[in-house]
Every structure is written in C-alpha cells, then in structure tokens.
C-alpha cells in the first residue's frame, strides 16, 4: 500500500501495439465542437466560445498527446486525444475551467499516467482501451449517475473542499511556521462525510508519532467535540464567517488525526487502510464498509462494483499510486461512455469525467520495471452512517495468498504459505487445506495457526503445512488452501494477490509431480489470431488473441517465450492477461521484441504464469508452432553465440572443473573488433564477477572459441560473502561503449555454485551432532546428520520462516535421486564402511549415467557420504 501525499497524484499504466495516425488540431477542434453540440445542444456557448488553450506533449518528446479545449470562462473543458488509437475524448467537464499552469497536483499526476500509457501504445508496447466495450452498461444499474457531491441535494451548495484555509487552521504548526495541510486522504473522507452530515461527534482517542520530517512528533488526544454541520458550507466563499472557519477546521483536524496523518511542508500523507478503521470506529459509519485493493478484482468487476456503489448514492473513497506516492480523491458519478466523475479535493478545480485507464485490462500491469500503476488503486466502499437499527456487520477479513513454495518428498508434501492482510483485522489466522481426490472425495483438514497484523503496512505472515503422502490417491489430487479468522463461521479459499488467482495445487501420484493451477482457468490461443514478423537477431513484433475456455477468471502476469527442440528458451515479453471465463473474444496480446536472440528455425510459442521462478524452472503452456525467419543484416557485424550446456551444471568452488566453452560466429556483413567478456551473474541479482575478457577480431563468417575461467579473478570468486553459493548465469557479451551487450543466440547457461563438501568443516567421519555448512547459508546448504537421528524428520526453514526442505532421515543402501523442489535434488547415501553416516545434499548432478542399483551417478569425488 502506498502512502498518499498532498502534492503527488495518481499515475495510470503503460501497455501494448497498433497502427494509426496523429489527429490534427483542426480535426481535434471539430471533435470538441461535435462533443459539446451533442451533449449540451441548448447551451449557447457550446461552440461559439470554444478555444484550444493547451497542447499536452510528452516531457522529452515533441509529439502531441492531447489537446485541451476550454469553453467560455467556466463552461467546461475537453481533452481530445492527438492519436486516433485512443477514444476521441479522454476527459471532460461541463463546468469549470482547465488551467494548465494551476491544475491540481493529483490531476497532473493522473495526466502523467495518461502520458505514459499513450506513449506505450504509440511505441507499439501496449494496446488502448476499446471505448465501445468501456461503454457497455452494467446490468440492472442506471446508465449514468450525476456527480453526487455537486447535484441533487447539493446542487445549490456543491461540496468543493480544499486542503488549506479554512480547513487547516487547527492543524499542527510545522517548524517552518507553515500550517500543515489537511492531506488528500482526510479531504476525501471529509467531503464524503459532509455529504451525509454525519456523525454528531467522533469518539475514542488518537495516539501516534509523526516521523515525516524526522522530528518524531507525538500526537495524542481525545475526540468528542460536537460538529456544527450547519456551519460547514460545501462551496467556500470569500466572506466565510469565523463560526464556519471554526466548524470546518475542528472537523478536519479530527479527520486528519483519526488516520494518523503525517505532516510536512510539502504535504500531508497517510495510508488508505486507516480510512476503513476511522470511518467505522471513530466516526460511526456502518461496520459493513470495507477497504478493497484493485488487484483483488478483475477489471470489469472492479468497475461494476464502483458503479453499484454510486447507484446506491454512496460516494467512493478512491486512491491510486504511481509506484512511489499517490493521491486520494472522491469518485461520485459515472457516464454511459465508460468515464467516471472525480472530485479532486482541490476546491472544485478540474473536477470532471475521466477514464480509469487508457489501456486494455491486459496492459494494466505493464509499467516501469513491469511494475504497473492502475493495479495499485484502492477504494473504500459501503460508506454510509450507522444506526442503532442497522449498524452493519464487519465483513470477513480479506486474507490473500502472497507466495507459495513446496517441497515433495517420499513422506509428505510440505507447503510454505505466505499470506497478506488487506483488512484492519489483527489476530490469529487459521490455515487448512481441502484435499480433493481423483474420485471427487473431499476432506477439509485444519493445519496451522499464524498471527497477522495490519498497522501502517499490510501485515504478512507465513504458515507451514505438511500433507502426508498417504492421504493422496493414484491420479491427480487437488489441494486448495483455506483460511479462517476469529468470528468467521466458514473456511474461505485463499486467492492469490500477485496478479493471478492461483489457488489450487495439483499433485499427481505416484510420480509425485506438483503443479500450481488457477482452478478451472486456462489460457488458449485463438485460431487465426497469431501475427508476427519474427526474424532472427532483429527487432520484431508479435500479436495474438488468447482466451479462457475454463469456468473461472484467469488473471496473471504471463511471460511469453520461444522454445526450441532442445528445450532452450528465448524471452519475448510479459503481459498482464485478464480473461473472463468462456469469453471467446479473449484479449489481444501485443509484444515488441528488441533484438530477438533466437536463430532462424522452427519454435514453439509458449507462455507461463509462474512469476516467482526462473524461466528455466517454470511450467510452460504450449500455444502454437512458429517460425523465425533468417536475418537480413549485412551492413554491420553480428555476433552469435552457441554453447553445449542446456541443463543446470553443478560447480564446486574449491576445485572447479572446466566450464563449457562459447563459440562466437560473426554472421554480419562487416568485421568485428572489440572486447568480449564472460561474466557470472547471480540469479535474482545484479551481482556478477568477470570470468574472461579478451579483445577479439572476427571477420565475416569467422568463428572463434572463448572459455570461461571462474578463477580468473580469484579474490572475487572465492569470496562466499560477496558471491554466495547458488545459481549463476554464465553470460557472454560485448563490452559496449556505455553498457554491455549480450550476444545473440545461446549466450548463456546456468551453473549452481557450491562450496565443496570435502573441504568444509563437516567433512570428518566422526559427526556426533547435526552440522550445517555454510551457516548462515544463502541458496544452498550441506547437512551432516549422525545415524542416531534415523527415523526423524529433517526440516529446514529460511530466516523468514518459510520451509525449504522436509524429509525423513533414513539410512539407505544406495545413492538415490529424489526431487525436492524446482531448485535441485536430494542425495542420500548410507553405504557401510565400518561406520554408518548420512549426509544430505541438495544439488543438481552433471552426470546421469545409469549405474543400476546405484541409481543416478554422483560426480566422482563428491559423494555426499564422505566415509564411502
């Protein structure tokens, strides 16, 4: 959840590709005239006083994004898109004025979001919304709702509050001598409460510290002053009376303190989750109101929910963030064209109708660093006064699945379940699992209880669940993770918050294969929709329509790639896919690929929703066979790499074997001369060390070989703190003028770097207690266990409490390979040599020669059992 500030606004999102052209000024002016003439034909100034006052351009580009037209002095404004791929009109108002020099900061942020979205479309990285689909009505609801805070009972005195005088006269005086602003969160809350003129007075206390300016200021007090609603005008005039100033500032002081407002000269901010608590407990609104995060709902369901609230005459508290900061405001109306009316909390300035986003649902997760913005929106709904007869019922806490890891052994499936709290609940969360056998039999099994909190940031916790393999039947077994909190009568399924509704785990027996699924949600390529110009080593584009033939929603950040017959993967791009069940229209996915790494040839187009795994460890869905054409570059050098290593290779730090070499071929039309380097890059990190550097000259068609040397920089390679054991990418690249440039083709392979067991502190034969090395460990650990522990269960947890390994300790007669996770394997050896000992080692083998009863071969000299 993002902290909301006075001076920073909401940024919407960036996304996918089309062909179109710019809109001229004259055409934009005609669009504006037609719009006002159609929507308000009786207004005399509809077209006569229309003028273009501002052209919005991208900060570092000269392209116009939209034109701003004002009508008369204060008869409304219009934002007309300067590119015909977008809706003609992207924002408008029938009263007021748009002043580019004095626009509210939150509107400025909103338009900055529009800018990023529009540039993404114009650059072929995103697709715009379809205005026809946006305008589809919500069943059983009015086609439009006039702005609640400005019409109806408020028509003669619209609610147009601000954050400065007279609302902040009782707010803290800052060290600079400036009176603190009320803050956008408090202003949005205050306007909604002014709509109801409720409560008579607040109750309870406030007690918190303000660390915004580093002064650690303590604020505490008791609520209880009676509010003089009759002296709180909606529209503040110049001649406001002292009584009105006191009434407004008393109320807004309480609102700010109720949400633990943090004050500073540049603005005041707090968390939206405090709004739910304050309205319910301090200001006596119905207990049934609730905070909801955008990522919990599909796009259409989100908009339908907001429309339903407004149809019930309930304004919606709305907030959004751009990845760092954001702004809160009030959504109080909607129109048939798919736009919503926003009151920015800036004295009425620029209040109007805007789209929630300009990008289709699948584009909403594509932002800077694939972060996205629109999905970081929040609302509080169900805001209405409580009464003794109808106080409302506190909704069940919203607990979500935030992360899931598993370990499958012969004895049990161990699950590490990370949960996140999107409510004001604080207490115990009970976790259970529902097991559905292949024959349909279901059982619900309580498993573990974990505590969770919510203060300031959303609380997180981790629970570990062990499911004995004896509970599984032959075939596909399905597991759902359930939760229940104090006061909940029934178990609820955990829904995944990370852009996907992953809530099922499938275990196939007797193989022991484990897969995650999205219930009955699938992603399938629509026949005839695939279009591309894929060419080896070139910039290219791909578009396709995917749909969901299942019965449940599919929403996940999907990675698309090419896979060759060897199993090598070539990354294409990522796209947030939001698919309604059974909707054969599906969603168009557009990808822009810069410098495709793949060679010419036949590939399989694949995708995966596994967000927390390395590409090589993910489960891939096959979509279609696809051909990559030959490259046609002849004017410059073009370096293509190849290497023989496909599988993960285990490398021992103390005695590293020779690593596979890279072949580099110049397939371009000119001689190459420059530096080539090989580096080892830590997975999930930017940490790397150099394993080779060489100045190389390659004529057209010439091939040379370069071999990595891990010990080339021994001071780094041997530093286990800087470069801990774990997975590394061995990458060959050109040292560019500014940044290194990865070669084309097969420019990397993976190794697992481990500290050699034979040189560690646990290599001796007389192990009398459990020993781990290294300790602390990062990605990899050796465990030495004396035979007296045979029959016990070994479990390893990381520092965050997540289970990484669970296995029964046994003395066996041969070395065996057992899958423990997507990261590696467990090797056990209990050969007798006068003394029994057991050593457990998680690693991948680089030799799979069949040895009969010995199972998978353990690399020579590195048997985990050092007494062998």
Curated annotation (Swiss-Prot):
Matches recorded under InterPro entries: Papain-like_cys_pep_sf, Peptidase_C10, Spi_Prtas-inh, Streptopain_sf
GO molecular function: cysteine-type peptidase activity
Keywords linked to the UniProt accession: Hemagglutinin, Hydrolase, Protease, Signal, Thiol protease
Signal peptide (UniProt feature, chain positions): 1-27
EC number in record: 3.4.22.-
Active site location: 184, 327
Top-level taxon of origin: Bacteria
GO annotation (BP), single: proteolysis
Family: Belongs to the peptidase C10 family.
General function of this protein: Appears to be specific for arginine-containing peptide bonds. Possesses hemagglutinin activity.
Annotated protein name in UniProt: Thiol protease/hemagglutinin PrtT
Taxonomy of the source species: Bacteria, Pseudomonadati, Bacteroidota, Bacteroidia, Bacteroidales
């Amino acid at each position: 959840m993002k902290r909301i500030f006075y001076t920073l606004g909401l940024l919407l999102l960036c996304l996918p590709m089309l062909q179109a052209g710019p809109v001229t000024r004259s055409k934009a002016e005609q669009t504006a005239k037609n719009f006002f003439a159609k929507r308000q034909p009786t207004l005399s100034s509809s077209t006569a006083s229309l003028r273009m006052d501002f052209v919005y351009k991208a900060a570092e580009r000269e392209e116009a994004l939209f034109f701003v037209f004002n009508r008369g002095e204060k008869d409304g404004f219009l934002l007309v898109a300067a590119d015909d791929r977008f809706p003609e009109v992207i924002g408008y108002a029938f009263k007021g004025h748009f002043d580019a020099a004095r626009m509210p900061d939150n509107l400025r942020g909103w338009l900055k979001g529009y800018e990023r979205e529009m540039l993404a479309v114009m650059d072929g990285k995103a697709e715009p919304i379809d205005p026809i689909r946006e305008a589809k009505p919500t069943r059983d609801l009015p086609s439009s709702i006039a702005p609640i805070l400005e019409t109806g009972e408020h028509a003669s005195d619209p609610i147009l509050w601000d954050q400065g005088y007279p609302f902040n006269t009782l707010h803290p005086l800052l060290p600079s001598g400036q009176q603190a602003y009320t803050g956008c969160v408090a202003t949005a809350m205050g306007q909604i409460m002014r709509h109801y003129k409720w409560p008579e007075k607040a109750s309870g206390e406030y007690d918190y510290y303000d660390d915004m300016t580093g002064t650690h200021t303590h604020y505490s007090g008791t609520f209880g002053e009676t509010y003089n609603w009759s002296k709180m005008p909606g529209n503040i005039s110049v001649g406001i009376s002292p009584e009105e100033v006191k009434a407004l500032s008393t109320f807004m002081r309480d609102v700010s303190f109720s949400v633990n407002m943090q004050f500073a000269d540049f603005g005041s901010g707090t968390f939206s989750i405090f709004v739910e608590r304050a309205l319910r407990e301090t200001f006596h609104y119905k207990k049934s109101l609730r905070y909801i995060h955008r990522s919990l709902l599909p796009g259409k369901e989100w908009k339908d929910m907001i429309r339903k609230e407004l149809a019930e005459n309930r304004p919606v508290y709305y907030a959004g963030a751009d990845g760092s900061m954001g702004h809160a405001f009030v959504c109080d109306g909607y129109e048939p064209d798919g736009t919503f009316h926003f009151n920015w909390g800036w004295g009425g300035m620029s209040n109007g109708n805007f789209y929630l986003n300009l990008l289709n649902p699948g584009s909403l997760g594509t932002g800077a660093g694939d972060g996205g913005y629109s999905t970081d929106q929040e609302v509080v709904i169900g805001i209405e006064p409580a009464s003794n007869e109808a106080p409302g019922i506190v909704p069940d806490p919203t607990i979500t699945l935030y992360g899931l890891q598993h370990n499958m052994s012969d004895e049990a499936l161990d699950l590490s379940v990370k949960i996140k709290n999107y409510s004001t609940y604080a207490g115990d969360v009970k976790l259970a699992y529902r097991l559905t056998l292949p024959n349909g039999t279901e059982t619900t099994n309580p498993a573990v209880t974990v505590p969770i909190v919510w203060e300031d940031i959303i609380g997180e916790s981790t629970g570990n669940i062990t499911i004995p393999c004896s509970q599984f039947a032959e075939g596909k077994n399905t597991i759902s993770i359930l939760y229940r909190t104090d006061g909940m009568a029934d178990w609820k399924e955990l829904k995944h918050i990370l852009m996907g509704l992953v809530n099922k785990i499938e275990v196939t027996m007797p193989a022991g294969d484990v897969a995650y699924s999205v219930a009955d949600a699938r992603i399938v390529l629509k026949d005839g929709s695939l279009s591309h110009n894929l060419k080896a080593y070139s910039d290219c584009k791909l578009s396709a329509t995917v749909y969901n033939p299942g019965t449940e929603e599919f929403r996940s950040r999907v990675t698309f790639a090419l896979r060759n017959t060897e199993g090598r993967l070539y990354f294409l791009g990522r796209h947030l896919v939001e698919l309604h069940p059974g909707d054969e229209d599906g969603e168009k996915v557009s990808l822009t690929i810069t410098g495709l790494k793949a060679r010419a040839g036949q590939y399989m187009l694949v995708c995966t929703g596994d967000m927390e795994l390395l590409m090589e460890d993910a489960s891939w869905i096959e979509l279609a066979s696809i051909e990559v054409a030959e490259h046609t570059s002849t004017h410059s050098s073009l370096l293509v790499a190849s290497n023989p290593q496909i599988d993960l290779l285990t490398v021992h730090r103390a005695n590293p074997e020779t690593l596979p070499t890279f072949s580099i071929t110049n397939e371009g039309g000119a001689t190459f001369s420059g530096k080539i380097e090989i580096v080892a890059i830590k997975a999930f990190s930017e940490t790397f060390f150099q394993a080779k550097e060489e100045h190389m000259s390659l004529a057209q068609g010439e091939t040379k070989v370069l071999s990595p040397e891990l010990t080339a920089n021994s001071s780094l390679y041997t530093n286990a703190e800087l470069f801990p054991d774990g997975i590394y990418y061995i990458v060959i690249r050109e040292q560019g003028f500014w940044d290194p440039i990865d070669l084309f083709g097969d420019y990397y392979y993976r190794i697992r770097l481990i500290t050699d067991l034979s040189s560690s502190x646990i290599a001796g034969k007389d192990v009398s207690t459990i020993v781990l090395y290294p300790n602390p460990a990062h990605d990899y650990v050796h465990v030495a266990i004396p035979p007296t522990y045979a029959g016990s269960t070994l479990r390893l947890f990381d520092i965050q409490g997540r289970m990484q390994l669970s296995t029964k300790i046994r003395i066996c007669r041969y070395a065996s390979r057992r899958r423990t996770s997507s990261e590696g394997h467990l090797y056990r050896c209990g050969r007798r040599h006068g003394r029994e000992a057991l050593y457990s080692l998680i690693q991948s083998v680089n030799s799979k020669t069949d040895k009969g009863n010995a199972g998978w071969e353990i690399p020579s000299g590195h048997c985990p059992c050092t007494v062998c």
